Amino acid sequence: MATYKVTLINEAEGLNKTIEVPDDQYILDAAEEAGIDLPYSCRAGACSTCAGKLISGTVDQSDQSFLDDDQIEAGYVLTCVAYPTSDCVIETHKEEELY
């Protein structure tokens, strides 16, 4: 099992933290375990409350059912169903930008 460094950033929220996330754990769950308060609602990849934007790196979010291909192409991720597949940087609190 691999573990990746996931950096969560959001200037408006004063957030800039790097956490270690195993490749079989969702990023949102790992953030909560580390005491980082991220927005979420359904926890099933079916809404946009937990949306973030991938600045660098890669994730597997094949369990999500909300984002369309254009949004995924633009780098949006649903942290509640995203597994890291490399070290990555994610800008959090991005739900508003989807609309």
From Swiss-Prot:
Residues 4-96 form the 2Fe-2S ferredoxin-type domain. [2Fe-2S] cluster binds at residues 42, 47, 50, 80. Its cofactor is [2Fe-2S] cluster. Disulfide bonds: none annotated. Binds 1 [2Fe-2S] cluster. It holds the Pfam family Fer2. InterPro entries: 2Fe-2S_ferredoxin-like_sf, 2Fe-2S_ferredoxin-type, 2Fe2S_fd_BS, Beta-grasp_dom_sf, Fd_pln. The keyword Coiled coil does not apply. GO terms for biological process: electron transport chain. PROSITE patterns: 2FE2S_FER_1, 2FE2S_FER_2. It comes from the Bacteria. One of its GO terms (molecular function) is electron transfer activity. The keyword Electron transport applies. Keywords: 2Fe-2S, Electron transport, Iron, Iron-sulfur, Metal-binding, Transport. Forms a complex with heterodimeric ferredoxin-thioredoxin reductase (FTR) and thioredoxin. Belongs to the 2Fe2S plant-type ferredoxin family. Ferredoxins are iron-sulfur proteins that transfer electrons in a wide variety of metabolic reactions. This is Ferredoxin.
